[in-house]
Amino acid sequence: MGDSIPPSDTAESVTAGHPDKLCDAISDSILDACLLIDPNARVAVETMVKGTEGQAVIVLAGEVSLNGHPPNYEEVARHTASSIGYTDSRIGMDATSQEYCQVHTHITTQSQFISQGVDGDLETQGAGDQGVMFGYACSETEGTPELRGRFFPLSAALAQRITRRLEI
């Protein structure tokens, strides 16, 4: 074996206008709309967007369980995207236009198999199919005075720092 390449970490941090930000905003708005109907609603909705000059698509998929009539998911998605500024097909999406922006909704009620694991009292309640995400503290940022005290992976701290400067 010859010389080996040392391992490297990468990280991503996106700015306003990135499709991930729009997708998160739409999914958050759907959650908010469901919680207005039923404060105990269970919502697992993912959003995907793809826009090109002249045509765009918003795809909503997932599972929702709530007591009451569900919100109009397409209306929530269009309103959220247009309130952010996606109102011109020349910039990739006109969410106000039925002609230039399609919304595909694939949202069903929660599977009975998952539901039975999360129904019941808090002592025996499971997590269903939702994952648990976690981070970790480390000393990588301690060697950089401006980042000291964050106890964060250096690659992630630098990615966020660059993003903040781009948004100024």
Predicted region positions:
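Short, charge-patterned binding micro-sites
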Residues: 45-67
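Short, non-transmembrane amphipathic alpha-helical segments
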Residues: 26-29, 34, 77-88
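N-terminal low-complexity, intrinsically disordered segments
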Residues: 18-21, 72-76, 113-115
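Glycine-rich, mobile lid/loop segments that gate access to catalytic sites or pores
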Residues: 10-14, 49-55, 82-168
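N-terminal, positively charged regions that mediate nucleic acid binding
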Residues: 1-44
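Short, conserved charged micro-motifs
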Residues: 67-75, 151
